[in-house]
Amino acid sequence: MGAGVIALDWDLRPLNTEGLYVAGSTSTETYGSAAAATGRYAGRKASTYARTISEGVISRGQIEKEKARIYAPVTRKDGIGWKELKAGLCRVMQDYCNEIKNEEILNIGLKWFESIEECEAQEVYARNPHELARVIECFTHLTMGKVIIHACLARKASSNGLIFNRLDYPEVDPPEWNKFITIRKENGEIKTRDLEFDYWLKPPYAPTYKENYDEHCDL
């Protein structure tokens, strides 16, 4: 599918997101080094943040809505099981977001995910806590599948460094596409943003790794 992670600042915080910190494989594409180095760093930043803010206002309506979504599978006695749902999601990714991509096939995959979300995902059941956990994982996989396809559609060029091949855009690493493409959902719409490959060394950050680490490490 290609390389892709959460875009972070020097506090290991998703860009423009307060109070959320990221560690491990979701924070970098440097394989095992992330697991060895980012947990303690992100923990320090989260601890510092927690000590400097007041208690937030809880949205009871949001909590009840999420509880209804999460526990809906345990209210069903029949339908489809989590294994069937997971197999369907994997098949969509295998068939429509494989190593070689193009816009038509990616859009078909996106329509399949939307159909599964509206139909099969509303019929899945869970008979015990174990099955409920697997169902929730499937819901997350469904969301991430859509995120990945939207990201693939946004990058209209192939790239060796990003392990990304577009059949309809075969030129590899054209200069105008030497950048990251981030996506977010805003008011129900998918928005994109360009970031330089070394944005973490550009203003408002310092130009060197050491300067940034010294400023942000909280040691």
Regions inferred by a protein language model and the residue ranges of each:
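Glycine- and aromatic-enriched mobile tails/lids
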Residues: A3-V22, T26-L219
